[in-house]
Amino acid sequence: MRWIGLAIILASPFSLQAEVYLTSQQFVDGAFGANTAKLETLWMTKEVAAQSDKILGHAPKQSRLRYWKSGLKTAWILDEIGKEEPITAGFIVENGKIMQASILAYRESRGWEVRHANFLKQYQNVGLLPDYFLNKNIDGI
């Protein structure tokens, strides 16, 4: 589950049929409430791409990543391959730590438990160590 560390850095788009639990707009609205978040862009420079490769174990596929920001809080929507199919996940990050993780869309035929609060709560307050590993162990399905 090292790909979660990339919530701060990288995502890659996929367009397969999915069971949608939250739309992107619902996730962003829930992250910031009445506060207006600004849509920003993280460009995949050589340095960012190298960091992403260390975290994910593969190179990024796009040249930029859009995210939302208000103050020190950011919201990221990322797509990453689960066992076989893409999973769309949302992460609210504040002060370098994941405050909330959500599954927005799930495309796998098994492992649906990942969308439940009992599984997702293990990501709360998770951050990156200097070596790009997570500072907490994450249990997989």
Please report, for each region that a protein language model flagged, where it lies by residue:
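N-terminal signal peptide c-region/cleavage motif recognized by signal peptidases
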Residues: 12-13
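Positively charged n-region of N-terminal signal peptides that target proteins for export
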Residues: 1-4
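Hydrophobic helical h-region of N-terminal Sec-dependent signal peptides
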Residues: 6-9
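Flexible, solvent-exposed loop/hinge segments and secondary-structure transition points
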Residues: 17-136
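Glycine-rich and small/hydrophobic secondary-structure elements
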Residues: 139-141
